[in-house]
């Protein structure tokens, strides 16, 4: 029996990124594989006709490539941390229906998926927690979730497409709180400069009737701007389209590689990595 998703619901907002990850898998099979997304889309009763029609457009295909690179980059950083901290907590912040934690599983780490209660309720049905895995129904901005994480073996946190919807002060408070709670841990996430965030925000800000786009989190020079928040933070960043992969694959056109350079350099689309405290 298929799981029915209605239009204009919270569940629908989770289905579209899932569809995008399925599209990535089909368009760029040498660069990205998300078998969970392919399987889940097949198990869901939802009218994908509009998404399928849009998937033929040039910008939708480039958007799918962006999603693929972002997920690959974050997974790379999680796996790099697990090489030196094999029993670490792997924490997906704002997880939706993303299964990156399980994809990075080394057989010893502890996996946590954190999101709002209504999101986790859907996740429990479609992606029930497996061995060494917990789904945590919490608001990311509420530090009460810190106590749910067993960081005795270290902790690596990642957030995909999440902080664009946070005020700068909210990101700063979260990062400083995590530095207190998880010394030796690492947080990785995607970010972009003010110009890019304004473009990302166009639609949802209009519907939310929010005027001050400038208050939302954006960053150009992450080591300088975020490093100033707290002396305990070790901050680095890499372009998220070309910082981890040269995209010299037959599935990626020269025009898309040009757009990738514009994204990394002009829009400062980047993966930011923050190390907390002294313990490594």
Name each model-derived stretch.
Residues 143-152:
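Short amphipathic alpha-helix with an adjacent loop that forms part of the alpha/beta core around
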Residues 157-158:
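A conserved beta-strand element that flanks and buttresses the S-adenosyl-L-methionine
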Residues 178-194:
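Conserved beta-strand signature within the Rossmann-like core of class I S-adenosyl-L-methionine
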Residues 198-213:
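Short, glycine-/aromatic-enriched active-site segment of Class I SAM-dependent methyltransferases
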Residues 213-240:
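Short alpha-helix
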Residues 232-258:
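Conserved catalytic loop of SAM-dependent methyltransferase domains
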């Amino acid at each position: 029996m298929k799981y029915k998703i209605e239009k204009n619901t919270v569940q629908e907002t989770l289905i579209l990124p899932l569809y995008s990850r399925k599209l990535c898998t089909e368009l760029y099979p040498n660069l990205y594989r998300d078998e969970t997304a392919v399987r889940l889309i097949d198990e869901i009763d939802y009218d994908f006709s509009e998404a399928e029609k849009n998937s033929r457009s040039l910008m939708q295909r480039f958007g799918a490539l962006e999603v693929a690179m972002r997920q690959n980059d974050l997974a790379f950083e999680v796996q790099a941390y697990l090489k030196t901290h094999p029993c670490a907590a792997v924490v997906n912040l704002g997880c939706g229906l993303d299964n990156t934690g399980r994809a990075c599983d080394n057989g010893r780490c502890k996996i946590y998926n954190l999101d709002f209660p209504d999101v986790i309720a859907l996740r429990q049905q479609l992606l029930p927690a497996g061995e060494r895995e917990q789904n945590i129904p919490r608001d990311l901005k509420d530090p009460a979730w810190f106590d749910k994480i067993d960081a005795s073996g270290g902790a690596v946190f990642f957030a995909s497409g999440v902080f664009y919807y946070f005020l700068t002060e909210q990101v700063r408070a979260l990062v400083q709180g995590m530095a207190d709670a998880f010394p030796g841990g690492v947080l990785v996430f995607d970010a972009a400069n003010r110009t890019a965030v304004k473009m990302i925000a166009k639609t949802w800000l209009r519907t939310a009737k929010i005027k001050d786009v400038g208050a939302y989190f954006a960053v150009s020079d992450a080591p300088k701007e975020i490093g100033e928040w707290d002396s305990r933070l070790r901050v680095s960043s890499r372009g998220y389209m070309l910082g981890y992969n040269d995209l010299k694959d037959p599935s990626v056109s020269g025009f898309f590689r040009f757009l990738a350079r514009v994204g990394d350099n002009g829009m400062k689309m980047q993966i930011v990595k923050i190390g907390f405290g002294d313990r490594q």
